[in-house]
Swiss-Prot record:
Transmembrane spans: 22-42, 86-106, 120-140, 157-177, 205-225
Protein name listed in UniProt: Uncharacterized protein MG452 homolog
Protein localization: Cell membrane
Assigned keywords, A-Z: Cell membrane, Membrane, Transmembrane, Transmembrane helix
InterPro entries: DUF1600 (IPR011631)
Membrane topology (UniProt): Multi-pass membrane protein
Source domain of life: Bacteria
Gene Ontology cellular component annotations, sorted alphabetically: plasma membrane
Amino acid sequence: MEQNNCKIRTWFAKLALAQKVFLGVIPLFFICFVFVIADIVISLQNKGHIIEEIDKFTNQSNVMLLIYACWYVSKPKSHYLKNQQFFLSAFAYIIFTFLGYNVILAASQQAYSDKDAYSLASSVFLHVLAPIAFLVAGIVKMKTDKDVTFNHFWKSLGYFMIYPLVYGLYLATIPYVRGHYVSDDGKSTTYVVYGEITNTKDNPIVAWPVVICFLFIYFPLSFLAVYALQCKLLNRPLKAQFKCATNKCPK
């Protein structure tokens, strides 16, 4: 037992500061993962399907946080973490989760409308605690992990946009594809992911501009902000990252 404890202490001592911070927030990310799985099970039991849980950007982005944190702590030099692509993308995605729920959905009175304690706790963990924890840990990583390389901006943006574009396509077409379904209150309605602002079928004048603006304005600009923050904290000129055409831009 003492020998095992010694190995753990030695392993912990070798971790970089950012790895230690991410290690500290893994339990929080795991709790959020449990909430996601629990909601999937509850949906399957009560409704016979899980689509309303697995198609939420919130749930997907929170699972992404746990995967990244565990991977970075255990294998920071992994091929899949090279060029900061996973990290920078997850950082920008979780900002959208935080702002999308606490600003946009809150303004339309769709946020924190849960009446039971469990649902409210789930919302707080997934939309507030986990995003803030990842952003704090991420900034520590940006500031202290100097030995990193990342793709030039346009290539990095291209990889980053794959997920939003696929998700946006789903978001815009699911009202047509799934059609009408019976909601929790027993009414037959068009299936949408995030209320009327994403109802491209019945509310196209509002929904289509919202979807298009987020895909082609918000997401590129938000990633630019995250990318610029990384460059600033590493004291690297942002302008050079636009011109560099190699996989690894100069430090």
